């Protein structure tokens, strides 16, 4: 994941909830800070589960971030001397994020995006599939299925302890009260 200083690139960390995507983003950003690189982290304003300002993992790790309403706002708030850009919860941004991330990487910067690759229905989520396609480095990580303990690649939404229906809205900000990590076999989406 390291290249010449005169080249930019895109890294994507994808997987279901509770797989450690945000922890990995924070780890990579902290390593860049140790290397004396200038970093900026962005997150969608709607992600206010644990903090309005910080990016916070389910495990409690956190790092300062800039909440933005849209992907275009990332360009507006990006400082000229930033070397490494982190973007958490990338799935919540519009498809314009793909163009913005490409533009930033084309300007010799490292961009790290973390997000859910699939929604609770098991379908590609937001700009993540396109980001994964254009990225130089993609890490698809797994959680542990909360039913059978096998590797989990999906996010199960629960409503009153039961699987959400296919007709339910895609975006619902929540944590353990609303979601579980599930494997392919244990994941359910009733019609």
UniProtKB/Swiss-Prot annotation:
Give the active-site positions.
89
Q: Listed GO cellular component terms?
A: cytosol
Query: For binding ATP, which residues are annotated in this chain's numbering?
Result: 15-22, 88-91
The EC number(s) given in the record are 2.7.1.21
Which InterPro entries does this entry report, sorted A to Z? Answer: P-loop_NTPase, Thymidine_kinase, Thymidine_kinase_CS
Q: Name one GO molecular function term.
A: ATP binding
Oligomer and partners: Homotetramer.
What name has this protein been given in UniProt? Thymidine kinase
